[in-house]
Amino acid sequence: TALLLRRQGYEVIGVTLGLWEKNDLSGVRDSCEKLNIPFLCREGHELFRQQVVDPFVKAYRSGLTPSPCCICNRRVKWILLQQVADELGVEYIATGHYARIKKLDNGRYTVQKSVTAAKDQTYALYNLTQEQLSHTLMPVGDYDKPHIRQIAEEIGLPVATKHDSQDICFVPDHDYASFITQETGKESKPGNFVDEEGNIMGQHRGLIHYTIGQRKGLGISSSTPIFVKELRPQTNEVVLCKSESLFSRDCHVDNINYMAEEKLTGPVKAIGKIRYSHAGAPCTLYPQPDGTLLAQFDEPQRAMTPGQAAVFYQDDHVLCGCLLYTSDAAD
């Protein structure tokens, strides 16, 4: 990002954020030295814990499956970067996301998909505000990943050989249950596995060990494959079902962040993405009187998961993004 902006004539300052465990900053520092640009680190551990880690733990213990990266971008990373920019009198924030900032004819800003669909990161950026977008640059989104690595290799930047990040940064081993237990000092309370009719099928280890659509690790014998359909924190039950019961056409979403439009006044066709790895599927958005949206997909979608971000696109840019809170079984 820094190199591309330098080539476009910008004056660049390198900034990294200290958010969780102490990071090895040698690679970032070496890259800045190679580019002959200033480098600084901004501390953000307290803000990160308050805005991301604590809500993540609370959500999981409530039977939700949160999307912490989406929250972190708006409430932590952009906040801290803007603080640095204001202190230094800098006009723009620039990041290395595989996405592009687009100003539409109606004057609103949105995030546009990267030229490389496989690396596109717009899903995680849906929550940015209009103010944040108006002061942000994302030059990497105009290139594919191999081209970016090639550019970095040509001038010997350490990031050229850096592996892609796959996990949530504060749970690198993907063991959410152990992390939550460590954070709270409390074991998750065991309860009942039940079928869709409420019949007890066995004992579960605690809600934090499960997520919607999960099949492995249930410890339940069945003549047909069974999956987690629902987590019920009120009764401490995990509802199990057969594969076909995981599919839904309708989902209800709230906490909406509108990008391409200020709001929706009637039904709108869109492509809905219900998790980061979801390819996206055609749907219609119906505004509700209480300010929420009903998203009705043309075809049933598997394992819509309360707490996850749902992001809706028109053409190649984000229309709006929100949090999924319920889904209705397919007809």
Language-model-detected regions and their locations in the chain:
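ATP-dependent adenylation/nucleotidyltransferase module used to activate substrates
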Residues: T1-Y126, L137, P146, E153, ...
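Short, glycine-/aromatic-enriched active-site segment of Class I SAM-dependent methyltransferases
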Residues: S134
